[in-house]
């Protein structure tokens, strides 16, 4: 009979279930047989339906922190949780069946409630933008790093050591004293048996090209010419060694003035290997001995940098033209060896100022230097003649140098026909 068969089946099932429960109470879940654990877990799973299996399938890529199991949960949870060693069931039961856990939304609510009691740690509200999002940003709002870079690009001209008001007078007095000590002999070329002024002019013109090739400072060129003249004032040199003297002088000047002077091998190279490295170093040693290691010689360039501070207002073209005229005076030993560098610088500054702006030697420099326009006149007349003949001079390296935009093309300016003296 169907009814009796169903009833007997239910009784047999309940008996079997009670036996399984007794086995679970008497057997350690960790040592239970695999088939018993599987049957218990499967039976419980069937009793709960298919929803847990679907949730398990979605949790298989859970973070590692979700795989940890608490001992308390194992002891207090259903028996089949501890019995099963399948990761999927463990993940599912640990998340879903533990009624003691606080849902994430409850945790957030409790944290917010706790923070709400303390105003000092309360979370701020949503911030609003200070300006509309579509408002165009002003170009002045730049990052500090970008502003620093722009400042560096604008300040291309290095700060002069002469621009120290507290020491202007002391610096000028010291330079005026040293220029007398470091002045070459006026007529030394007459005592040279094998070289002439024209050979010296060719050497200086070549040194101008060397300075441009290696991007050396103008001061380096002025120092090198001073070393050459002082050396030739004391030593007789054959024409075959004159370039060696100039190379050693340029090497010394670059070591004294430049941050990164060219290597000795570079100076050997620019002589087209006419001299060896050993010869250059030996000549450098000899020049140092003859000069008594006095390398800090005042130059026309140094005095010009002092005179430029007295421009009202400052004019870059005047400065470039004065530097051009100062370098022209390096080419010809006669007549410029008889003038002090401070006097040549004064004549160059006045001639440049007059050519560009029509102004004259300022009164502030009369008080500072003691040079009046009348005292500058002899040197000024010689420099004016040199300026007029510069385009026809045999040596053209200085004119080519000052044609560049870096120096505002001042060598292309027409010199004045007359002077206001």
From Swiss-Prot:
Pfam families, A to Z: Cyclin_C, Cyclin_N, Cyclin_N2
Alphabetized SMART domains for the sequence: CYCLIN, Cyclin_C
Post-translational modification as stated in the protein's UniProt record: Polyubiquitinated via 'Lys-11'-linked ubiquitin by the anaphase-promoting complex (APC/C), leading to its degradation by the proteasome. Deubiquitinated and stabilized by USP37 enables entry into S phase. Ubiquitinated during the G1 phase by the SCF(FBXO31) complex, leading to its proteasomal degradation.
UniProt-listed Gene3D superfamilies: Cyclin-like
GO biological process: cell cycle G1/S phase transition; cell division; DNA-templated transcription; G2/M transition of mitotic cell cycle; positive regulation of DNA-templated transcription; post-translational protein modification; Ras protein signal transduction; regulation of DNA replication
Region called Disordered, residue ranges: 1-60
A GO CC term assigned to this protein in UniProt: cytosol
Presence of keyword Cell inner membrane: no
Subcellular localization, as worded in the UniProt entry: Nucleus; Cytoplasm
Modified residues (Phosphoserine): 5
Primary localization: nucleus
Keyword Ligase: no
GO molecular function: cyclin-dependent protein serine/threonine kinase regulator activity; protein domain specific binding; protein kinase binding
Residue numbers carrying N-acetylmethionine: 1
This protein's UniProt keywords: Acetylation, Cell cycle, Cell division, Cyclin, Cytoplasm, Mitosis, Nucleus, Phosphoprotein, Ubl conjugation
PANTHER family: CYCLINS
Protein family: Belongs to the cyclin family. Cyclin AB subfamily.
Its job: Cyclin which controls both the G1/S and the G2/M transition phases of the cell cycle. Functions through the formation of specific serine/threonine kinase holoenzyme complexes with the cyclin-dependent protein kinases CDK1 and CDK2. The cyclin subunit confers the substrate specificity of these complexes and differentially interacts with and activates CDK1 and CDK2 throughout the cell cycle.
Subunit structure: Interacts with the CDK1 and CDK2 protein kinases to form serine/threonine kinase holoenzyme complexes. Interacts with CDK1 (hyperphosphorylated form in G1 and underphosphorylated forms in S and G2). Interacts with CDK2; the interaction increases from G1 to G2. Interacts (associated with CDK2 but not with CDK1) with SCAPER; regulates the activity of CCNA2/CDK2 by transiently maintaining CCNA2 in the cytoplasm. Forms a ternary complex with CDK2 and CDKN1B; CDKN1B inhibits the kinase activity of CDK2 through conformational rearrangements. Interacts with INCA1.
Protein name in UniProt: Cyclin-A2
Organism: Mesocricetus auratus
